[in-house]
Design a protein with these regions (language model features):
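Solvent-exposed loop/turn segments at secondary-structure junctions
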Residues: 4-7, 49, 56-61, 97-100, ...
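C-terminal active-site rim and adjoining tail of enzyme catalytic domains
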Residues: 113-185
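Boundary/entry segment of secreted carbohydrate-active catalytic domains
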Residues: 3, 111-113
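Acidic (Asp/Glu)-rich catalytic clusters
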Residues: 40-51, 76-88, 102-109, 121-129, ...
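Alpha-helical scaffold elements lining the catalytic groove of polysaccharide deacetylases
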Residues: 65-76, 125, 131-136
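Aromatic/hydrophobic pocket-lining residues that form the small-molecule binding cavity
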Residues: 34, 38, 72-75, 160
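An active-site metal/cofactor-coordinating segment within enzyme catalytic domains
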Residues: 1-50, 55-58, 62-65
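Structural detector of well-ordered beta-strand residues that form the stable sheet scaffold
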Residues: 52, 92-94, 113, 154
C-alpha cells in the first residue's frame, strides 16, 4: 500500500491505512487490482522476481522516532525469515534522497535504490546508492549526470509507452510503472 490514505488510489474513499482493518482494505479495488499484503505478494512471486521495498516512515527522512525504527527492524526481520535468511538476493531497499535507512539496509547486505527528483541531484552523492531512480521527464542534463554515475537507473513513474520510450532514450536501464502491461517496451 503506497499512500497513507485510500483517497487517491480508490476514488470515493478516504480511509486511513493505519487504522482501517484489513478486512475492509482487502475489499477495495485500485486501478491495478486489489490491495495486497506484503506476505501475500511474497507467497505468490516466482523465485526470479526481485522486489523494491521501502519502509515509508524511515525511507524519506533522517528518522529518529523509536517506534518507526522498531517497525523498520520488524520489516527487516520479516524479510529475513520470508527469504530464508538471504533477503538481499530478492529485495532492493528503496529510499528517497533524505532517507537514512540505506545505511541500515546496506549493513544487512541489501542493495539500495534512491528515488531522486531533478532538484535533488546537484547535492546528491550518487555513489551512495546502488541504483538511481529519476523522473522520466527530467532534463537530458540531469539524466546525463545520473548515467555518468555508472549505476543502473530506473525511470519513474511511467504511465504509458511514450514515457517509457522517452526514459529509455535518455539512458534509463529500467522502468517503474503502476501498470507494467501498459508500458512494457
Amino acid at each position: 500500500i503506497h499512500d497513507w490514505k485510500t483517497t487517491r488510489t480508490v476514488p470515493g474513499t478516504d480511509l486511513p491505512i493505519w487504522s482501517t482493518p484489513w478486512s475492509t482494505l482487502r475489499t477495495l479495488q485500485q486501478g491495478t487490482g486489489p490491495f495486497m499484503r506484503l506476505r501475500d505478494i511474497v507467497d505468490q512471486i516466482p523465485d526470479d522476481v526481485v522486489l523494491a521495498i521501502d519502509h515509508k516512515t524511515t525511507s524519506s527522512e533522517d528518522q529518529r522516532n523509536t517506534a518507526d525504527l522498531q517497525a523498520e527492524e520488524r520489516l527487516f526481520e520479516y524479510l529475513d525469515t520470508a527469504f530464508g535468511g538471504h533477503p538481499e538476493r530478492r529485495v532492493i531497499w528503496k529510499i528517497f534522497a533524505k532517507g537514512t535507512s540505506a545505511a541500515r539496509a546496506k549493513a544487512r547486505g541489501y542493495r539500495t535504490m534512491a528515488m531522486l527528483y531533478p532538484a535533488e541531484v546537484p547535492a546528491a552523492d550518487l555513489g551512495s546508492w546502488d541504483i538511481i531512480g529519476m523522473e522520466w521527464s527530467a532534463s537530458a542534463e540531469v539524466w546525463n549526470r545520473i548515467n555518468a554515475s555508472g549505476r543502473p537507473t530506473i525511470a519513474h513513474i511511467i504511465t504509458n509507452e511514450g514515457q517509457a520510450r522517452t526514459a529509455l532514450d535518455k539512458g534509463a536501464s529500467g522502468l517503474m510503472a503502476s501498470f507494467p502491461s501498459r508500458v512494457h517496451p
